[in-house]
A protein has these predicted regions:
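N-terminal secretory signal peptides
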Residues: 1-19
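N-terminal twin-arginine translocation
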Residues: 16-23, 33-52
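N-terminal [4Fe-4S]-dependent radical SAM core
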Residues: 17, 47-72, 78-134, 149, ...
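Short cysteine-rich clusters marking metal-coordination/redox-active sites
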Residues: 73, 142, 354-357, 379-382
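Short Cys/His-rich "knuckle" micro-motifs
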Residues: 83-86, 153-154, 364-366, 389-392
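Extended interfacial segments that mediate partner engagement and assembly in macromolecular machines
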Residues: 102-183, 188, 194-195
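Conserved AdoMet/S-adenosylmethionine-binding subsite of the radical SAM
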Residues: 162-322, 330
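Short linker/helix segments within small regulatory modules
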Residues: 367-374
């Protein structure tokens, strides 16, 4: 296979164990999320609610049929070329007799109701809940991944829900959510599922949102933008070497994704996980903030998030709060107006202040929202429009 490593059926990377739902909750920093008690469980005679390795093969989008049953995937920058029976780098897309299939369509391994602030979205319907889904797999291999137990797994090794797109929308409505979020792993790898759900949200009064690393090719991104209302994108570092060594990817496609989403009018927030000694250099942070200001605009929300030792970086140390505060000062100095600190519950930098008059607009304590001073998307004090989505979708 050219362009990426071969993933054999059911194979896990060395040192990875099979995921249980309990382990996922325990291992995630988002342990406050609640596993949704699905109100529309199918009858046992028809199917089981959860099955290990459940799969619904679905013909993949963006594939190029080559000679001798070779298929090239055109979804992400890896552009994997696979022989019959092989999978791409993500571990969830497989060549079957010259046709590429997604193995995770309609079978997520994680279904949660989260505060929208957990994504994180600080400028999208504050205080609301988001119906959050993820499948096994990822097209990146971050050494610091917090959800590695599912992102680095194949669908054979996870317990999966039978949850087609229409049931996602029904579940979100039943749970009182105002949005659906494709999150926890890289949602690009369940592209067909994500876009199908996104199309259904349009007539259901739900926002379609994602938290992504932005590792996607231009053509599928243009189509995805049609069904997305908001996106949080991880800009893991402003350094190609960091992406190569710690992410197993490239920086340039992520920058292109950010610019495309801005151009297409998708609400955009950016997250940078600050890892001591790896991407916390002041000049690197200043350069990143200047790029965000110039290419995405000074009103783009930026979240500096605290690193905790996980996965292959468990011997490293958490980010000092002072490092995050210094990064925020650099961002403000560069001209960014909405700069937040994450994974530090109770810090004043969780709050939103008006870029016009500086007064408090939204008070937060972790994922909890307190006082709000917005009126129809504008500052209650000075009337300046605040970037974001503040009104429930009709």
């Amino acid at each position: 296979m050219k362009g990426c490593r071969v993933a054999k059926t059911g194979e896990l990377p060395p040192g990875i164990r099979r995921l249980s739902r309990r382990a996922f909750v325990r291992g995630s920093l988002g342990a406050l999320a609640l596993l949704l008690p699905l109100p529309w469980r199918p009858k046992p005679a028809a199917s089981q609610e959860i099955q290990q390795g459940f799969s619904r093969p679905y013909r993949a989008a963006f594939q190029k049929v080559m000679t001798s049953r070779m298929v090239q995937c055109l979804l992400c920058p890896r552009n994997c070329e696979t022989k019959d029976g092989e999978r791409g780098e993500c571990g969830v897309r497989e060549n079957r007799k010259g046709i590429y299939y997604s193995l995770v369509y309609g079978n997520p391994c994680a279904v949660y109701v989260d505060p929208v602030e957990k994504k994180p979205f600080f400028h999208v319907l504050p205080g609301s809940r988001s119906f959050s889904i993820a499948t096994a797999g990822c097209n990146l291999h971050c050494k610091f991944c917090q959800n590695w137990e599912i992102s680095q797994a194949t669908p054979e090794k996870t317990d999966n829900f039978d949850l087609p797109p229409e049931k996602v929308v029904a579940g979100a409505k039943a749970a009182g959510c105002l949005s659906v979020a494709y999150t926890y792993v890289e949602p690009i790898i369940f592209y067909e599922y994500m876009t199908a759900v996104g199309r259904l949200t349009k007539g259901a009064g739900l926002l379609s949102t994602c938290h992504s690393a932005g590792y996607i090719n231009p053509e599928p991104l243009e189509e995805l933008a049609q069904v997305l209302d908001a996106a949080t994108i991880d800009l893991k570092a402003f350094d190609p070497h960091f992406y190569k060594e710690l992410v197993d990817g490239k920086l340039e496609p992520v920058l292109n994704t950010l610019k495309t989403l801005r151009r297409r009018g998708v609400h955009l927030e950016v997250v940078n996980l600050v890892i001591p000694q790896f991407n916390d250099q002041p000049q690197n942070i200043s350069d990143m903030c200047a790029w965000i200001r110039d290419e995405l605009g000074p009103l783009t929300p930026l979240h500096f998030s605290r690193f905790y030792p996980l996965y292959k970086m468990q011997n490293h140390f958490p980010t000092p709060v002072s490092t995050l505060e210094s990064a925020r000062e650099l961002a403000l100095k560069a001209g960014l107006k909405y700069v937040y600190l994450g994974n530090i519950p109770g810090h004043q930098a969780e709050n939103t202040h008006c870029h016009g008059c500086g007064k408090l607009l939204i008070a937060r304590q972790g994922y909890q929202v307190g006082e709000m001073h917005l009126k129809e998307g504008a500052c209650e004090y000075c009337g300046v429009k605040i970037p974001g989505i503040w009104k429930q979708k009709a």
